[in-house]
Amino acid sequence: EMTSSLVGSEMCIRDSYRTDNHGKGSWYSINGNIDYQRTSRKNKERMITLSYKINSQPQTNDSYNTYLDIEPDENKLDIIKELSLKNFHSDGKTNTMEQTFQVDYTTPIGKLHTIETGAKYIFRRNSSDNRFYEAEGASENYAYNENRSSEYRHLNHILSAYAGYTLKYKGFTFKPGLRYEQTIQEVKYLVGPGENFDSNFSDLVPSVSLGIKLGKTQNLRGGYNMRIWRPGIWNLNPYFDDQNPMFISQGNPDLKSEKSHAFDVAYSSFSAKFNVNVSLRHSFNNNGIERISRLITAEDGEDFGGGHIAPHGALYSTYDNIGKNRNTGLSLYLNWNASPKTRIYVNGRGSYTDMKSEAQGLHNYGWNGSFYGGIQHTLPLKLRLSLNGGGSTPYISLQGKGSGYQYYGLS
């Protein structure tokens, strides 16, 4: 509860009122899963696994904001009108429900080969119903306000299937794989701003890895993988938001999934005295989702269809797959057990980043590095003394550089 007062020019209280906020809400999480696995009697490494999982998170929120004791009483109606004092009541319900069905099958072929395959289906439903009611200050005659209310349904159908093959021969391992993913989205806005739309994404995601044992304590591995990021609802929604007619925004339902490609090579060596891991990684993305803005220069404005016209001089913003990003990095981890009671460790990383946004006319690149390390020593009575420190150079962003840091500690 809060009290507000308005002071006049003669430093006396002109009017005052109290604000009362109260409400109640609930939050639940419901989880469950069932798994079934069957192993072949002839070969224990041949198996099939069936899985089902469900998760639901219903929430409710019922809140009131009320103006009380509006004084002076003889000016109550004028005060309510001048200060736009409106009691409001918000009654909201949301729920996220997800069900996952999955099957996995693994079988060896001879002594050297293994095949893995499987499929997964995810059904995800997000729903929200938030009703907003208003009344003039000091009144309880609440009226439904559709403009400030919202109700929507987001349905996601995610289907994926994968196949993988593994070859193991002495110290050599070769493992290629391929995954197919399809996402179907259905978005409906029953109340409030927003435009109904559907989207469909289909992606093939390959991967491959190689591993070689160089003796009993050394390994060399390399590989390639691709990761995908799908655009969010706000990126896709074609709703023409011209609440401010000079600053217009609209999603792009034709966006594609972002695809990031990564190659890496790593060497590791482990022994009682030394542990070493060195890795080199290069990644790039040629279709990053970027927000693009442009001025409407046509004297008569620009027609975007559906009766939507952006006036001359307005700033129109949407999204497109035009971002580019490249990064090459080298990392090192070293652990040396100098004595039974002393351990020295070092962890460092250096990378070169190149980022470009054609829509914004921005291009930035540069080096970045980070390091931390320390010494640990065990004292008598099993007390442990630790000295550590580290730092980082400024990181590279599209519009400049961030801040670096350094630290040290003794414990």
Predicted segments with their positions:
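Single conserved hydrophobic/aromatic residue that forms the stacking wall/gate
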Residues: M2-G8, C12-I13
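Extracellular loop and loop/strand-boundary signature of outer-membrane beta-barrel proteins
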Residues: D15-H22, D35-Q37, S84-D91, Y144-E151, ...
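Face-selective signature of the C-terminal outer-membrane beta-barrel domain
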Residues: N21-K188, N277-V278, R326-S351
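Outer-membrane beta-barrel proteins
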Residues: G25, N43-E45, P58-S63, N126-N130, ...
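Residues that define the transmembrane beta-barrel architecture of outer-membrane proteins
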Residues: S26-I30, N95-Q99, L155-L159, N200-L204, ...
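Structural signature of Gram-negative outer-membrane beta-barrels, strongest in the C-terminal barrel
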Residues: G92-Q102, T106-S127, Y144-N275, S279-N285, ...
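Outer membrane beta-barrel strand-and-loop segments of large Gram-negative receptors
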Residues: E98-Q102, A143-S150, Q250-N252, K256, ...
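Conserved C-terminal beta-signal and adjacent last beta-strands/turns
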Residues: N364-S411
